[in-house]
Amino acid sequence: MVDQESLVSFSSETSQSINSDIDIESQQQPRQYIPSNEKDGNKERLHLTRTETVKSLQEMGMTQDAPIPDVNAPQTTTKNAIFPEEYTMETPTGLVPVATLQSLGRTSTAISKSRTRQIERSVSRRSQNIAASSNSSNKEELEDEEEVSSDMSNQQPELDPEIEFVTFVTGDPTNPHNWPLWIRWAYTVILSCLVICVAYGSACITGGLFTVQEQYHVGLEAAILSCSLMVIGFSLGPLIWSPVSDLYGRRLAYFISMGLYTIFNIPCALSPNLGGLLVCRFLCGVFSSSGLCLVGGSIADMFPSETRGRAIAFFAFAPYTGPIIGPLVNGFVSVCTRRMDLIFWINMAFAGVMWIIVAFIPETYAPVILKWRAAKLRKETGNPKIMTEQEAQGVSVNEMMKACLIRPLYFAVTEPVLDLTCFYVCLIYSLLYAFFFAFPVVFGELYGYKDNLIGLMFIPILIGATMALATTFYCENEYLKLVKKRKPTPEDRLFGAMIGAPFAAAALWILGATSYKHIIWVGPASSGLAFGYGMVLIYYSLNNYIIDCYVQYASSALATKVFLRSAGGAAFPLFTNQMYHKLGLQWASWLLAFISTAMILLPFGFYYYGKTLRHKLSKKDYSIDTIEGY
């Protein structure tokens, strides 16, 4: 019969076996590589002189508790990483052995701390149950003990202690964070132009919908599908390009996707029927979506978290200004030439230029850069156990599906705070596309303007968005000041949305109130100024709010946002024209104004009560509030 003392002793021993691994290594000097006379071709193998020790890692601030992975950490591997700092830290040697991490107290990738505690509690519970039950049989008790022992043995660390994880070395020129500031900002501008190119492509046809009607002899609603289907493609493309980026890098994802996008503009221009055009436009959306789903990550790759806010603010300007250029440019193209194909040739030229330019941007994704470094070191040293943690774990299709598909859907049905935030982003994005079809009714039918002059009416939106860009820098400075005073909360990110929300609602009230023939065109056109200003501020602020609320699963939360935003952007154009004709110019605008006015409460309500709502309505708190030392 197994008594209580033996099980308690068993619990203690198993607990020690998990957390043991050895404080001997921490007392040793950095491990030496034995020089080798082997030659690889005409080159002697590289002899690395040292690797990091527990002491050196502790001096760099590493502790037993693994921090939360970076926002850009790979999503194609399991989540229980023992070295999540690998992709953001620099070490003097560039190599951190698994044995050293285990000596530091890090558990293996195969077992999480929570699982360890769960097993220990299970052992303790069984001990108490056996002490309380005098009628238990010996056989049952032995089975319990064997079950726990088996559970523990199955969860032993699986990583080879001789594996050495590669990191950037101190001051590493291949680390994007160490590139000259002007280079990083130049790449930020180029990548933002890539986003503008993609967003422009979605709305390029709105400046000449009548050319689609004339070309294929279809109605306006059928012609509008050429815009909506590309936006739907935006929502599905990230399912392809996010895993490609994780596995092979952002540069390759951009090169392949933008190349396909450029090529598929050719059948758009030459399609003999509407069906062919719609299929190709959808595929253009799928291929070009890499620009929308990866550029934010590329910019984050180049800037530390403390300084990336301004660069991300600049990026937030791009997806909302790109569509505005579509009717602005192609209104003149369609009126002057009456050729639908020329609109797509221009779009192809724009995409082709960006394809070539982006091809010259070096890889920015740290996991892939380190993977290349590890391969080089394996070749030069002959040590096959130098690798990244992503390589050591291998690709997890299960985790990839969770990150790209299952978790975004799970968040959509279980996170009301995320749903409300995404709904507001979706509303603003949808209203932008609604303007593309409301302005032709207001300025075309009321004032008698042609598409070229209607396109000019979008300039105020562009001006308002530019003004908002300057305000985002102000918001970022205020946030940095706050961070120096106290620990930030996700709600601190809502300052920009609180400024922009009233402007977005006011724009629609102005549009409705000034849509009369006896009022000069400046009245309804000025609504775009307020809308552009509020639109960019709301998107910038809520995007950061989502990241801080779901920091550990930010990519999945943002995927939820992209899907809902694209769905709204695709749907609104399909009924905007009919809504303005059925309700009238005033009440159609005011209906949207009522909705936008009600949504003003969201950033203010979340600012004051967001933390309480997240705790009450969310299944789990994923925010920066739960991260110690953040």
UniProtKB/Swiss-Prot annotation:
Q: Where is this chain's protein located in or outside the cell?
A: Cell membrane
Does the keyword field hold Cell membrane?
Answer: yes
Write down the Pfam families for this protein, in alphabetical order: MFS_1 (PF07690)
**Which region ranges are annotated with the description Disordered?**
1-46, 107-157
* Listed InterPro entries: MFS, MFS_dom, MFS_trans_sf
Q: Which residues are glycosylated?
A: 135
**Gene Ontology biological process terms in this record:** spermine transport
Q: Where is the composition biased (Polar residues)?
A: 1-35
**Can you list the GO cellular component terms from the UniProt entry?**
fungal-type vacuole membrane; plasma membrane
Q: Which UniProt keywords apply?
A: Cell membrane, Glycoprotein, Membrane, Transmembrane, Transmembrane helix, Transport
From start to end residue, where is composition biased (Basic and acidic residues)? 37-46
In the induction comment, the record states: Expression is up-regulated under spermine stress and depends on the pleiotropic drug resistance transcription factor PDR1.
Record-level Gene Ontology MF annotations: spermine transmembrane transporter activity
For the keyword Nucleotide-binding, the answer is no
- Free-text function comment from the UniProt entry: Cell membrane polyamine/proton antiporter, involved in the detoxification of excess polyamines in the cytoplasm. Involved in the resistance to the imidazole antifungal drugs tioconazole, miconazole, clotrimazole and ketoconazole; to the triazole fluconazole; but not to the antifungals flucytosine or amphotericin B. Plays a role in spermine homeostasis, but spermine accumulation in response to clotrimazole is independent of TPO3.
Question: Which family is annotated?
Answer: Belongs to the major facilitator superfamily. DHA1 family. Polyamines/proton antiporter (TC 2.A.1.2.16) subfamily.
The name under which this protein is listed is: Multidrug transporter TPO3
